């Protein structure tokens, strides 16, 4: 059902696929966004998980479909089909693991192979709460994002740092948003997250 700001238009749905190596925090970022919580017990995602969240923006309501992919090699063959019809690819690395950062180039290449330029890509350096173990500087992250022409942000799913800002920036760039290239408007978007009213739909047998 549309909010008043939608002017009678149907609720628009956008697919976000989360990509990256195992244990970089993809599931934790989604959990923090959905429920504002963090689970200290690590459990690998099996296959693909699916959750959705309604976001109330300043002038419209959108439905984000969040697809959480497994980082393990044995599930890699599943991922291209989920990238294929995505609007946004969120490519995550662990700032304490330089290999996970290096592998983001491959993930971004995979996205562009499937989607060409018709996709929003956000590079995310997660786990800033472990700054004393940092192996990848924020400058290195910014440099790679600039070289690959993607968006960039650092986050901490554990501390909740910049997680809402991550989704604000993605929302500002969604198709149909005015001035999608005007980064100065990103902080002006007011996002209200609904409380989960129903059991989220999961695929893949893991809700971690």
Curated annotation (Swiss-Prot):
Mg(2+) binds at residues 27, 45, 68. It is a lipid-anchor; Peripheral membrane protein. It is an enzyme of class 3 (hydrolase). GTP binds at residues 23-28, 39-40, 42, 45, 71, 126-127, 129, 156-158. Regulated by guanine nucleotide exchange factors (GEFs) which promote the exchange of bound GDP for free GTP. Regulated by GTPase activating proteins (GAPs) which increase the GTP hydrolysis activity. Inhibited by GDP dissociation inhibitors (GDIs). The modification Cysteine methyl ester is found at residue 208. The keyword Protein transport applies. Coiled coil: none annotated. Keywords: Acetylation, Cytoplasmic vesicle, ER-Golgi transport, Golgi apparatus, GTP-binding, Hydrolase, Lipoprotein, Magnesium, Membrane, Metal-binding, Methylation, Nucleotide-binding, Phosphoprotein, Prenylation, Protein transport, Transport. The keyword Transport applies. Belongs to the small GTPase superfamily. Rab family. Interacts with BICDL1; leads to its accumulation in the pericentrosomal region. Interacts with SCYL1BP1. Interacts with VSP52. Interacts with RABGAP1. Interacts with GCC2 (via its GRIP domain). Interacts with RAB6IP1 (via its RUN 1 domain). Interacts with TMF1. Interacts with CIMAP3. Interacts (GTP-bound) with APBA1/MINT1 isoform 3, also called Mint1_826, but not with isoform 1. Interacts with RIC1; the interaction is direct with a preference for RAB6A-GDP. Interacts with RGP1; the interaction is direct with a preference for RAB6A-GDP. This is Ras-related protein Rab-6A. The lineage of its organism: Eukaryota, Metazoa, Chordata, Craniata, Vertebrata.
